[in-house]
């Protein structure tokens, strides 16, 4: 069970098409994957380097083996598994943390303000804000910094979280 991070993205632009594009990304169930696509783990064989990662005893599969999607009513037995060992393929976890900044997709996405020149989106992420996703948004849409917020496209990202007995926040400009 993660600690949740509440994220807010605000976009201001005189280009309504860019506003619509960003809105469309966050109307999907997988906005992070839309911006930074996750590999298809069923097509990527295990390597010597990834064979024992996160495993303290037996390897998760065989070198060169690809995982398969297993369906099961029990959620602990469903998902990507290696046929030779029936162990879970958890390579997604490190990849997502490295490439999205968090282990899961955005959840509880809400478009809280939607005008022709302003968009505000809120969502939650597990443990931490999706900083790499924010950087891709800024780069893809050529966002201005805070001093130039009234020209072109300006995007601000804020996040808030609570840990036992303390609160934290941050922002990217």
Regions flagged by a language model, labelled:
Residues 1-173:
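Long, contiguous binding/interaction regions
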């Amino acid at each position: 069970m993660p600690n949740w991070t509440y994220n807010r993205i605000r976009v201001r632009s005189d280009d309504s098409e860019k506003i619509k594009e960003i809105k469309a990304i966050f109307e999907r169930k997988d906005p992070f994957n839309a911006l930074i696509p996750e590999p298809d783990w069923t097509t990527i064989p295990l390597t010597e380097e990834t064979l024992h990662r996160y495993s303290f005893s037996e390897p998760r599969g065989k070198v060169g083996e690809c995982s398969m999607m297993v369906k099961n009513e029990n959620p602990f037995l469903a998902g990507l598994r290696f046929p030779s060992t029936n162990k879970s393929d958890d390579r997604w976890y490190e990849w997502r943390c490295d490439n999205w900044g968090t282990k899961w997709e955005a959840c509880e996405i809400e478009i809280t303000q939607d005008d022709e020149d302003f968009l505000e989106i809120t969502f939650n992420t597990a443990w931490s804000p999706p900083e790499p996703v924010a950087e891709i948004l800024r780069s893809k849409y050529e966002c201005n910094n805070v001093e130039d917020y009234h020209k072109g496209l300006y995007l601000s990202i804020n996040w808030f979280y609570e840990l036992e007995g303390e609160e934290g926040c941050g922002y990217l400009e």
